[in-house]
Amino acid sequence: MLKIAVPNKGSLSERAMEILNEAGYAGRGDSKSLNVLDSANDVEFFYLRPKDIAIYVAGGQLDLGITGRDLAADSRADVHEVLSLGFGSSTFRYAAPAGQGWSIEKLEGKRIATSYPNLVRDDLAARGITAEVIRLDGAVEISIKLGVADAIADVVSTGRTLRQQGLEPFGESLCTSEAVIVGRRDEEITPAQRVLLSRIQGILHAQNYLMLDYNVDRDRLDEASAVTPGISGPTVSPLARENWVAVRAMVPLKSANATMDKLASIGAEAILASEIRIARI
């Protein structure tokens, strides 16, 4: 039986559980449940602190886990990314009071508050900077106002919380992050794990693509196919209308409108886009 770790709370939790549910797995009926047995799919899900997930996976107690790239890196657990999930995007930045001309070099000898001490220590060491790293488990932004730190290092999504506290990020980002599935390093994916990953990839593909159908003169088919190459080539079927064909292809959701405009410009007709619920590609 597969043992899979899922964030029990926080920004990654809700979306991770939605994807698993859409992929056909049992959900967490009670928000206080620590584990859910999905006997139909031969999987048990464990709801854990996001910061701890990579440690459990590296230790062999769990097969795979959903966590943040930054959290996995800060844990220093011996894991690797198996699949990026495309949500929970953020950057990890230094920040300090706005308008004071901070730079990374000015961190020398200063106090830096963070919930990611290992990431910060590694970055400072790589830059040859000596500073005091103060670990906090939350509300890092208020630490400067309370006199605990001179600067902070934290996850930045919109930057609104920083601005509310009169802070601004400075220097280049320490890392970029998003939700990922991690597995033990140097361990091959098993067939059972591959099924789960395939289901999740199918959901991600379905969310990021549309199915496009249209009719076009066969003489313009090469042009149309160049606009809609699909995943492994478009599906082309003859129409009763002489010298015309029906074409079907997957297109990225983000560029669907521009793609439809291009098709219309070369004479395509009856251009229709439909959602994809589940896919295996």
UniProtKB/Swiss-Prot annotation:
<keyword id="KW-0547">Nucleotide-binding</keyword>
<keyword id="KW-0328">Glycosyltransferase</keyword>
<dbReference type="InterPro" id="IPR011322">
    <property type="entry name" value="N-reg_PII-like_a/b"/>
</dbReference>
<dbReference type="GO" id="GO:0005524">
    <property type="term" value="F:ATP binding"/>
</dbReference>
<dbReference type="InterPro" id="IPR015867">
    <property type="entry name" value="N-reg_PII/ATP_PRibTrfase_C"/>
</dbReference>
<keyword id="KW-0028">Amino-acid biosynthesis</keyword>
<dbReference type="InterPro" id="IPR013820">
    <property type="entry name" value="ATP_PRibTrfase_cat"/>
</dbReference>
<dbReference type="GO" id="GO:0003879">
    <property type="term" value="F:ATP phosphoribosyltransferase activity"/>
</dbReference>
<keyword id="KW-0460">Magnesium</keyword>
<keyword id="KW-0808">Transferase</keyword>
<comment type="function">
    <text>Catalyzes the condensation of ATP and 5-phosphoribose 1-diphosphate to form N'-(5'-phosphoribosyl)-ATP (PR-ATP). Has a crucial role in the pathway because the rate of histidine biosynthesis seems to be controlled primarily by regulation of HisG enzymatic activity.</text>
</comment>
<keyword id="KW-0963">Cytoplasm</keyword>
<protein>
    <recommendedName>
        <fullName>ATP phosphoribosyltransferase</fullName>
        <ecNumber>2.4.2.17</ecNumber>
    </recommendedName>
</protein>
<dbReference type="InterPro" id="IPR018198">
    <property type="entry name" value="ATP_PRibTrfase_CS"/>
</dbReference>
<comment type="similarity">
    <text>Belongs to the ATP phosphoribosyltransferase family. Long subfamily.</text>
</comment>
<dbReference type="Pfam" id="PF01634">
    <property type="entry name" value="HisG"/>
</dbReference>
<dbReference type="InterPro" id="IPR013115">
    <property type="entry name" value="HisG_C"/>
</dbReference>
<dbReference type="GO" id="GO:0000287">
    <property type="term" value="F:magnesium ion binding"/>
</dbReference>
<dbReference type="InterPro" id="IPR001348">
    <property type="entry name" value="ATP_PRibTrfase_HisG"/>
</dbReference>
<keyword id="KW-0368">Histidine biosynthesis</keyword>
<dbReference type="Pfam" id="PF08029">
    <property type="entry name" value="HisG_C"/>
</dbReference>
<keyword id="KW-0067">ATP-binding</keyword>
<dbReference type="GO" id="GO:0005737">
    <property type="term" value="C:cytoplasm"/>
</dbReference>
<dbReference type="GO" id="GO:0000105">
    <property type="term" value="P:L-histidine biosynthetic process"/>
</dbReference>
<comment type="pathway">
    <text>Amino-acid biosynthesis; L-histidine biosynthesis; L-histidine from 5-phospho-alpha-D-ribose 1-diphosphate: step 1/9.</text>
</comment>
<keyword id="KW-0479">Metal-binding</keyword>
<dbReference type="InterPro" id="IPR020621">
    <property type="entry name" value="ATP-PRT_HisG_long"/>
</dbReference>
